[in-house]
Structures are given as structure tokens and as C-alpha cells.
Amino acid sequence: MKSYIEPFIASKALSQNSQKAYRYDLQQFCQLVGERVNQDKLLLYQNSIANLSLSAKKRKLSTANQFLYYLYQIKYLNSYFRLTDTMKVMRTEKQQAAIINTDIFYQKTPFVWGQLISLLILELGLTPSEVAGIEVANLDLSFQMLTLKTKKGVRVLPLSQILIPFLEQQLIGKEVYLFEHRGIPFSRQWFFNHLKTFVRSIGYEGLTAQKLREQFILKEKLAGKSIIELSDILGLKSPVTLEKYYKS
């Protein structure tokens, strides 16, 4: 199984530092699990990282899950195995969610629909209903802008350069909506299922649309946006729901 580490790393667009981290984590994983993967060995690996910090544990689980999925794709494994963090983390009201490393969200994946849904939430802070309502006519990729029309009003949101290729790929053949079938928007359940499948494939099972939107809020606050500015970006009637993120 160790011989597949380098081909796996080569299949992903990673920086030099990320390659080193992936290589280190996977060498440890393979050393403990060995050449034959089964649930007992995976449980052994989970126990071996149980006392690490939450961020380190999440990173190792994510890396191992990506590798396991890769091995399943290339038919090295006959079954799809997956590691889950069974440790429950207790939080007090004073504790806030931490900003996660989102590099993996931009990497190549077979789950392109779920990926784009998650990126639109991460990059723009959209709700699932706002994502579903994106119309082709309101996307201007040349000027990198999205005009979002909702019952609350109209917002013009800038599109980052990194988001453009993902949008270009999915705009091909669309008639009315970005997410549609022959001009008819997909159902709410369709969005839920595709988002769930994608985040699970990259090791973030349980990461909901609400939590992804929270990541946008945390990053915008960190970038220096005031509570009023952020409220306007999100199209909120009042900044009250954002107050918990701005408490010292």
C-alpha cells in the first residue's frame, strides 16, 4: 500500500509543504495499518491519534480518508473504508468554531456539483436557497460579479479569481439556472445530498451548509469586516445574528 502514496500525492494539486505533510501522515498510516485494510486496523489507527490536538487529528483523518478513497477508485481496495472521529468535543457558549483549512475544497474531485455548492457558500456566504436561485443571466464572469436577486432585495457580490474556473465548467449547457435540469432548478434534497457526498469524500463528514457559511463569516471578520459590512454582504435585515462572532 505504501507504493501508492506517491501516485496519490501526484494526483493532487498540493504545495510543497502540503505534500510533505500528506507524505508524513500517510507513511505513519501505512506503517500502522499494513498492507491489508480492515476495520480493526483502522480502529487501531484511530486510537493511535486519539490524544492529538483536534486540528492535527482532523488533518490526519482527512488525509487518510482521501487516500482510502483513492485506493478504492483505483480498485486496490474492493470495499470503501472510512475513518470517523468518534470523539465528542464538548463546547461552552463562549467557545466559537475555529477556521478550518479549506485548501482541500478546491482540489480535483468527481463530486463536482457538491464541490461548487460548497465553494459558493465558502466564498460568498450564500444560503442553500440562494445557491439554488443563481441564474445564468446574473453571472458575469468577465467582470467577476454575481447579481443575486432574492425576496430580501438585490446584492452584487464579487467573484474571486479562484472560483471562476469552477463556474465556467458548470455553466456549459445551462438555460436558466446554474443548477438545473432543462431549465428547472433542482430540489432542496438534491442540494443536500450532493453537498453531503462531497464533504464526506474530503473527510469533513457532518460539515453542513450552515457550518460552511459560518466559515465565511469567521474569515470575513478576520479580514477586518465590521458587523454592519458583513450583515450587508449576507443580505441580513439586522446584524443581531452576527453579534456572537464579534463578542470579545
Curated annotation (Swiss-Prot):
Residues 1-72 form the Core-binding (CB) domain. Keywords: Cytoplasm, DNA integration, DNA recombination, DNA-binding. SUPFAM superfamilies: DNA breaking-rejoining enzymes. It comes from the Bacteria. Residues 85-248 form the Tyr recombinase domain. One of its GO terms (molecular function) is tyrosine-based site-specific recombinase activity. Putative tyrosine recombinase. Not involved in the cutting and rejoining of the recombining DNA molecules on dif(SL) site. This is Tyrosine recombinase XerD-like. The lineage of its organism: Bacteria, Bacillati, Bacillota, Bacilli, Lactobacillales.
